[in-house]
A protein has these predicted regions:
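Conserved acidic residues
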Residues: 103
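Short catalytic micro-motifs in class I SAM-dependent methyltransferases
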Residues: 109, 113
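Class I (Rossmann-like) S-adenosyl-L-methionine-dependent methyltransferase catalytic domain
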Residues: 1-45, 49-100, 114-194
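A conserved beta-strand element that flanks and buttresses the S-adenosyl-L-methionine
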Residues: 106
Length: 194
């Protein structure tokens, strides 16, 4: 297994090898954002990369949006696109080291980018940084993908084994409005902290 450290991710951005990056908000996540009414929600996007999700939220009046990423280049890309985005909300850190608490966490290609051995720890960490009744919402791949490098795939049964101890499963179903090249390969998830 390759080391999925800061150098690995910075090199992906330097070499423009960001095949996971849609260059826009994923349609299912945009649809979810568009129905949110509480602009005061404290939102985290872990492993957010270029985070078009953060940009969309910020430009639509959500000012409590945080992005955490190992890659300083990805965070600089966000700042270049949105100069008014607060520096204090661009967290150059390892997600597993953060301690702040959030109302909502958005999952968009982070879970599939971490070493699969860290998945139980991911579920536990998400639970610990969510406020009472907080939610994890986003997309998980529902497909067998790579075994030695990201993106790593999985399936609903596997994911339930990680999340059921910590969350009420409001939704974990095939996504009907995925981006065209991800059709039939994604689950839309909405989990609420127990």
């Amino acid at each position: 297994m390759i080391k999925l450290n800061e150098d690995f991710w910075n090199n992906k951005y330097k070499d423009n090898k960001t095949g996971w990056d849609l260059g826009a908000v994923s349609p299912p996540i945009k649809a979810y954002f568009d129905q949110l009414e509480n602009k005061e929600l404290k939102i985290l996007i872990p492993g957010g990369g270029n985070s078009y999700e953060a940009e969309y939220l910020f430009k639509n009046g959500f000012k409590n949006v945080f992005v955490v990423d190992l890659s300083i280049i990805a965070l600089e890309n966000i700042k270049t696109r949105i100069p008014e985005f607060p520096d204090s909300q661009l967290l150059h850190a390892n997600f597993f080291d953060i301690e702040e608490r959030f109302d909502l966490i958005i999952e968009q290609t982070f879970f599939c980018a971490i070493n699969p051995n860290l998945r139980p720890k991911y579920a536990s960490k998400i639970h610990s940084v969510l406020k009472s009744k907080g939610k994890l919402v986003g997309l998980l791949f529902d497909a067998k993908l790579n075994e030695d490098h990201p993106p790593f795939g999985g399936n609903k049964k596997e994911y339930l084994s990680y999340f059921e101890p910590y969350f009420l499963i409001h939704n974990m179903e095939p996504c009907y409005n995925s981006y065209h090249n991800r059709q039939g390969k994604e689950l839309f998830v909405m989990l609420q902290k127990k």
